[in-house]
Amino acid sequence: MSTMLLNRNTSMAPAVHRQNVQVLLEKIAEADAILVGAAAGMSASCGFNFFYQNDAIFEQYLGDFHRKYGFIGAFNGFYYRYPSPEAHWAFLARMGYMEYECPTGQPYYDLMTLLQGRNYHIMTTNQDFQFTRVVSEDKLSAIQGDSRYYQCSRRCHD
C-alpha cells in the first residue's frame, strides 16, 4: 500500500523527493511507535485555505460575512470586533457548519493508509474536524482545542 502512495504522489516529483519519501516509508516500517504532528499545512494540502484567505469554500459559507464586515479569511473572523455578541455567535455557528460540511481531504486518508496497522498517535493544532473523521479520538490530541465544543464564557449551555 505504501508503494502505491509513493508512486501516485511522487511520480512527477524530482528524484531527490522520491528518495526522501522512500526513506520516510522505510522509517515508518521500522518504527515501534509513531508520533505525528500536524498543523494548518495538513488542511492547506487538501486545498482548504479558508482560514487565511477567501477561497471558494470561504465564499460559499462565509462570503456574506466578508462582504458585510470586510475581513479576509475565517481566522480574521474569529477576532473581528462584531457589533454584538449575536453577530459573533452567528459567525461561529456558520464556521462550525462550514467545517462539518467540508469534505475530508485526501491527504488525511493517505496519512491513515500510511499509519494502518501501526502504533501511532497524532497531535494537532487543527480544529477543523478533519482528523476526527479518520482517526479514533483515543489516538488524537487536539492541543489547541476542538471547535466542535464551542461554549459561551458562562458555560450555561452544552
Question: Model-flagged regions — what are they?
Answer:
Residues 1-158:
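Conserved catalytic core of sirtuin-type NAD+-dependent deacylases
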